[in-house]
């Protein structure tokens, strides 16, 4: 039997990786194994093997056709992993670029991955803004409340399109301030 393929997404600063890590720890104590894979890191590893990039930032400068091929290679590799295990794919539904929103899972990626579930980790935009302001370790674009709310709304719309294409379900998990355990509980219930 193939493992579950669960895509977990969220805007920068929502705490997506924190919720994923907490859920994986909890599931491990129950004997439910998942492997977490960061889609961008997987792409970079392929690019590095092919001597196309020495760091992740260089990937953005590659020709569009090369980037598409790297995305396809990453999607194929990650999909193959699900034959052996349950997989959490840590990625973004959309990426905000200077020219607009870019789909994080274009058609050629979805065709390979065919996720069972897409999870959107969300919280109130003001909480995300405060987290971003308090995180000196990351170089994130500064956005206001309205821009963060718009990004989360767009993620929902794009995720609905992903569901229409793949037949997957969509789950929204809230990661509210001081309620991390509740967010972890919600993700665990989806992953069981």
Swiss-Prot record:
User: InterPro entries in the record, alphabetically?
Assistant: Adenylate_kinase_AdkA, P-loop_NTPase
Give a Gene Ontology cellular component term annotated to this protein: cytoplasm
Q: Which reaction does it catalyse?
A: AMP + ATP = 2 ADP
Domain of life of the native organism: Archaea
| Binding positions for ATP per the UniProt entry | 10-18
Signal peptide (residue range)? none
EC class: transferase
Query: Carries keyword Cytoplasm?
Result: yes
Ordered alphabetically, the record's keywords are: ATP-binding, Cytoplasm, Kinase, Nucleotide-binding, Transferase
Please give the Gene Ontology molecular function terms for this protein.
adenylate kinase activity; ATP binding
Q: TM segments?
A: none
Instruction: Give the family per the record.
Output: Belongs to the archaeal adenylate kinase family.
Q: Write down the NCBIfam families for this protein, in alphabetical order.
A: PRK04040.1
- What is this protein's name? Adenylate kinase
Record organism:
Methanoculleus marisnigri (strain ATCC 35101 / DSM 1498 / JR1)
User: What lineage, starting at the top, does this entry show?
Assistant: Archaea, Methanobacteriati, Methanobacteriota, Stenosarchaea group, Methanomicrobia
**This protein's encoding gene:** adkA
């Amino acid at each position: 039997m193939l493992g579950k393929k669960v895509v977990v997404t969220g805007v920068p600063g929502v705490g997506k990786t924190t919720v994923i890590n907490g859920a994986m720890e909890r599931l491990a104590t129950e004997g439910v194994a998942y492997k977490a894979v960061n889609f961008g890191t997987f792409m970079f590893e392929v690019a590095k093997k092919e001597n196309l990039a020495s760091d992740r930032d260089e990937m953005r400068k590659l020709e569009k056709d090369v980037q598409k091929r790297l995305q396809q290679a990453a999607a194929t590799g990650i999909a193959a992993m699900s034959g052996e295990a349950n997989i959490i794919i840590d990625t973004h539904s959309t990426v905000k670029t200077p020219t607009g929103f870019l789909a994080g899972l274009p058609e050629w990626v979805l065709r390979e991955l065919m996720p069972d579930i897409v999870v959107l980790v969300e919280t109130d935009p003001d909480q995300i803004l405060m987290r971003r302001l308090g995180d000196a370790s990351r170089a994130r674009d500064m956005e206001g409340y309205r821009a963060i709310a718009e990004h989360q709304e767009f993620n929902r719309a794009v995720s609905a399109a992903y569901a229409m294409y793949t037949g997957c379900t969509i789950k929204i998990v809230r990661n509210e301030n001081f309620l991390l355990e509740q967010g972890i509980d919600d993700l665990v219930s989806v992953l069981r």
